[in-house]
Amino acid sequence: MAVDSLVGRIAGVSYLHIPARDAAASAGFYRDVFGWQLHGRPDEPGFSDGTGHVIGRWVTDQAAVGADGLRAYIYVADVDDTLDAVTTHGGQVVRPPYLEGTLRVALFADPAGNVLGIWQETSDSQGSR
């Protein structure tokens, strides 16, 4: 039976809660750095990531996810440019870019203290498809 869905995939990661004390400020950070589309009330913003695969919202009743625990990674076109945007908009670089196999990866903390990763494909990974 077909089921209509906002993200259209079964068993894929599709919905996130992002902890933040100030949901509106955190939403602005992700909008400005990653271009995420915001919706809902300003005090309880939701988002879609622009790919059609991930949606979510900011929650103020949970502690930030620091360096330990499950970590989400966001696919970006350029790790260095994204880290520049992260720091410009109040985030911090937690681990500078490094290679993980054929991927270029870095870790950052958003202004609320959540640690996430970003990654881009290298020319080696793109050539091996």
Indicate where each model-derived feature is located:
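Short Asp/Glu-rich motifs
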Residues: 50, 105-106, 128
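Conserved short beta-strand elements that form part of the metal-binding/catalytic scaffold
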Residues: 35-69, 115-121
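Amphipathic alpha-helical segments
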Residues: 22-37
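Hydrophobic pocket/interface hotspot
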Residues: 16, 26, 30, 82, ...
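Vicinal oxygen chelate
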Residues: 22-23, 74-115
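Short glycine/proline-centered loop/turn elements that form peptide/ligand docking sites
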Residues: 41-45, 99-101, 125-126
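N-terminal beta-strand motif that seeds the catalytic metal site of vicinal oxygen chelate
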Residues: 1-25, 53-54, 70-72, 121-129
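Residue-level hotspots at or immediately adjacent to binding/recognition sites across diverse folds
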Residues: 15, 59, 69, 85, ...
